[in-house]
């Protein structure tokens, strides 16, 4: 669905010159790592340790994005952005972490997979910024990375499950179709933000997505407001305010 949304809208943004740039190949290669490889690592982590640990470690991706941006792109991180990034990460972690969840021997491999997925997500923001400098087309960037990534996900699913997901209900198809539309919009917004701002500024804000997941769940009455949720959302908002404070 994500690729279909980009293709349908392509007459308004696709340019033939983009196909012959170095940035084209950067985003094509990017798709092999995210969403393809990062999804594989996430699934392995969830199978071994569950969604809680996996989601908590996913919140650390902004720090990897900031580090790689400073090393590879020469970006500078102000004190407010550094503090805001750490505050935001702590807030997101507080939303997903269950007290009393310890680290066991069984979970150690899962932690490696989850950390690898977080590193990839962080690095993708840096490579995306570099690619956009060579091919300043946010829509093309999203189209390329998720076309290649979508094919990679199908290959991974086939290897893991032994078959492709061909039998789906109508309700499931509609739900995934709607989800794909939102994901396509989110991807376009992310690359548009990276096109205009630094990785150290954009990445921590992107990392707040679990907050909106919780808010949507609350709106659909699938979650109840608890002290942990209220506190976590407050901390995340405070972190984002610090990051964008001028």
Residue ranges of predicted features:
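Membrane-interface interhelical linkers
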Residues: 1-29, 39-49, 97-115, 134, ...
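Alpha-helical transmembrane segments of compact multi-pass small-molecule transporters, enriched
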Residues: 1-5, 57-71, 86, 148-152, ...
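Interfacial helix-capping/hinge residues at the ends of transmembrane alpha-helices
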Residues: 42-43, 54, 65, 69, ...
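Hydrophobic/aromatic residues within transmembrane alpha-helices
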Residues: 45, 71-77, 131, 141, ...
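Selected transmembrane alpha-helices and immediately adjacent juxtamembrane segments
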Residues: 109-133, 137-140
């Amino acid at each position: 669905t994500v690729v279909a949304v980009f293709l349908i809208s392509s007459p308004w943004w696709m340019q033939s010159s983009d196909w012959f740039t170095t940035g084209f190949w950067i985003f094509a290669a990017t798709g092999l790592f995210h969403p393809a490889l990062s999804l594989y690592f996430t699934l392995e982590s969830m199978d071994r340790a569950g969604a809680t640990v996996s989601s908590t470690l996913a919140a650390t991706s902004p720090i990897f994005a900031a580090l790689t941006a400073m090393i590879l792109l020469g970006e500078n991180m102000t004190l407010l952005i550094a503090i805001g990034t750490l505050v935001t990460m702590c807030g997101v972690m507080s939303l997903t972490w269950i007290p009393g969840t310890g680290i066991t021997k069984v979970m150690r491999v899962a932690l490696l997979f989850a950390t690898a997925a977080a590193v990839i997500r962080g690095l993708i923001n840096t490579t995306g910024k570099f690619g956009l400098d060579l091919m300043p087309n946010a829509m093309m960037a999203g189209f390329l990375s998720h076309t290649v990534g979508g094919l990679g996900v199908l290959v991974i699913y086939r290897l893991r499950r032994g078959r492709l997901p061909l039998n789906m209900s109508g309700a499931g198809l509609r739900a995934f179709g709607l989800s794909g539309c939102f994901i396509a919009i989110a991807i376009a917004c992310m690359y548009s933000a990276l096109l205009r701002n630094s990785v150290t500024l954009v990445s921590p804000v992107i990392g707040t997505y679990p907050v909106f997941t919780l808010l949507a769940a609350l709106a659909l009455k699938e979650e109840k407001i608890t002290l942990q949720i209220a506190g976590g959302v407050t901390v995340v908002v405070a972190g984002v305010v610090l990051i964008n404070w001028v």
